[in-house]
Regions:
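Charged docking surfaces used in two-component/phosphorelay signaling
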Residues: 14-22
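CheY-like receiver
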Residues: 126, 133-173
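Active-site residues of response regulator receiver
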Residues: 66
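C-terminal output helix
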Residues: 35, 119-128, 132, 136
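Receiver (REC) domain active-site loop signature in two-component systems and cognate sites
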Residues: 69
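Acidic, metal-coordinating helix/loop segments flanking the phosphotransfer/catalytic sites
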Residues: 29-62
């Protein structure tokens, strides 16, 4: 997977980067919201991604944003990215209390994920890698909005996918 990270704390950004790269993900890190947007725009231009082109793949599989950053905060970055690509997957990794961020996230009018710091780096990896699982669930005609509304754990999502695969194998046409 191709991951873009905006995190102003260098040690945390490095931890995320190293952990994800160990899992063979390609990682771009930026230290503030302004540089995150620059990296996102550059990737769009380099790959000639069309803004609002639903048929195109996205420049990054996931964008991980800290909320409070210098220059431009994570919420502003998310707004701009989602205006360009409404299907872009965004994960907020923030020390802010979930309840505080939830109201702001609702204003985005898009589904974004939220991880409250501190968390184990393996939790981040599980969250990032759920994207592949969600893609397979979508291929099985599962309503992802309902699944995300339930807010299942990584293990529950994997269990659901295994069960659906079993059901799918049992179907005969």
């Amino acid at each position: 997977m191709n991951v873009l990270i905006a995190e102003d704390e260098h040690d945390i950004a490095l931890l995320y980067k190293m952990a994800l790269e160990r899992r063979n993900h390609q990682v771009t890190t930026t230290e503030n919201g302004e540089n995150c947007l620059k990296a996102y725009h550059e990737k769009c231009q380099n790959r000639r991604f069309a803004i609002h082109d639903i048929g195109q793949t996205l420049p990054f599989d996931v964008v991980i944003l800290d909320h409070k950053m210098p220059k431009i905060n994570g919420m502003q970055v998310a707004e701009e990215i989602l205006a360009m690509n409404p299907r872009q997957r965004i994960i907020f990794a923030s020390a802010y209390v979930k309840e505080t961020l939830t109201d702001s996230i609702r204003k985005l009018k898009q589904v974004v994920e939220l991880m409250q710091k501190p968390f184990n780096v393996n939790t981040l990896i599980d969250t990032v890698e759920d994207k592949e699982i969600y893609s397979e669930l979508k291929q099985l005609d599962v309503d992802l909005d309902i699944i995300k509304a339930i807010n299942p754990t990584h293990e529950q999502i994997i269990d659901l996918l295994k069960r659906l695969r079993t059901v799918q194998k049992g179907r005969t046409f």
